[in-house]
């Protein structure tokens, strides 16, 4: 996939995030690895990734999911897509919360960049129709995540450390 095939809008809304250029590089690598793994045709597509804080994501989580608590990542697909199907040009939005991501990375002993890449991939798969509501869906989605992260030289995020 060429670097220009997918347009990624990055917005740092709130939170103590790294420099926007570094975030854009991490997001682009993660999205392109996912696109390649899924075998999607090169197509002009667009998505936005908003880097925010726990307070902002908690508001969205309460409004859209009925869960009044922060979460690490939310995805808002522009249009419904069946998992594995070629998406349209507008993919949707991924929102990521700094404090939750940082806390999870620390608690799980993972580099922040690896955890962030995982959440970008996770959110991107949601935009492409993947879900984890059932065990069968979770198995498929998590398998894809593992493959994509492996291509990025990131260890299995679901491996239980002893």
UniProtKB/Swiss-Prot annotation:
Cofactor note: Binds 1 zinc ion.
GO molecular function: metalloendopeptidase activity; RNA endonuclease activity; zinc ion binding
Obligatory cofactor(s): Zn(2+)
Domain of life: Bacteria
The EC number(s) this enzyme carries: 3.1.-.-
GO CC, one annotated term: cytoplasm
Gene Ontology biological process terms in this record: rRNA processing
Principal place of residence: cytoplasm
Function, as annotated: Single strand-specific metallo-endoribonuclease involved in late-stage 70S ribosome quality control and in maturation of the 3' terminus of the 16S rRNA.
NCBIfam families named in the record: rRNA maturation RNase YbeY
Sequence similarity: Belongs to the endoribonuclease YbeY family.
Protein name: Endoribonuclease YbeY
Organism name: Brucella anthropi (strain ATCC 49188 / DSM 6882 / CCUG 24695 / JCM 21032 / LMG 3331 / NBRC 15819 / NCTC 12168 / Alc 37)
